[in-house]
């Protein structure tokens, strides 16, 4: 059997911690069974800091866990934000100290239970209704952009679509099932989106870059027919 020696890369707020040693890593994401929608992904990791370098990690910093594939290209497998951070000194001497950085990160779905919406929806297909709910939270419009922010400040490779996208992934639209209209009734966004996804026989999930996505009822069969395999 071929020995699997994974090459990892941890990026926090866009900074790759290549001089640190990844000592422990746990990632949990998806759903527990087919009868419920996915919960927020969870990542717990420890980094050994043997370099005496100053650590600059804050709550809500972005976290990306990447794994090198057979072409030496790093592929993201988890994306989220820091919700807990601790530093533990494991050894100390006359020259310096060695630290363990303990980081807990949550995926994008953790944002939805904290956001409320009136949930007014017109009769439409499942994917379009879910997109309508999520885009108001995860896509900024011109009026929501700070006045001091100018297009010239963006990296040339960025477009408006990704520069102000704060977590919306692939949404299968329009979907396969037409859902009833919904009148104003205040609810948290997770409960609403989960109910819409269940009604459409689809599922919400976090992609490897930490974005919230929706797969409709035929997503896997269409993907299989197109690419010859499906992602679990």
Regions from the language model: what does each represent?
Residues 1-59, 92-139:
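Juxtamembrane "anchor/assembly" segments of surface/extracellular structural proteins
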């Amino acid at each position: 059997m071929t020995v699997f020696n994974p090459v990892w890369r941890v990026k926090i707020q866009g900074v790759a911690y290549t001089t640190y040693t990844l000592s422990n890593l746990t990632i949990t994401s998806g759903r527990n069974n087919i009868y419920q929608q996915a919960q927020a992904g969870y990542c717990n990791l420890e980094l050994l800091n043997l370099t005496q370098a100053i650590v600059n990690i804050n709550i809500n910093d972005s976290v990306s866990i990447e794994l090198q594939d057979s072409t030496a290209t790093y592929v993201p497998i988890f994306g989220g934000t820091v919700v807990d951070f601790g530093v533990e000194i494991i050894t100390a001497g006359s020259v310096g100290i060695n630290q363990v950085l303990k980081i807990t990160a949550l995926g994008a779905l953790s944002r939805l239970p904290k956001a409320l919406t009136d949930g007014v929806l017109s009769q439409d297909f499942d994917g379009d209704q879910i997109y309508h709910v999520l885009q108001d939270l995860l896509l900024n419009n011109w009026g929501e952009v700070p006045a001091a922010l100018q297009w010239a400040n963006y990296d040339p490779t960025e477009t408006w679509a990704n520069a102000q996208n704060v977590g919306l992934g692939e949404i299968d639209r329009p979907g396969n099932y037409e859902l009833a209209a919904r009148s104003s009734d205040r609810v948290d966004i997770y409960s609403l989106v989960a109910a819409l996804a269940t009604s459409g026989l689809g599922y919400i999930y976090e992609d490897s870059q930490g974005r919230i996505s929706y797969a409709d009822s035929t997503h896997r069969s269409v993907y299989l027919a197109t690419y010859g395999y499906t992602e679990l």
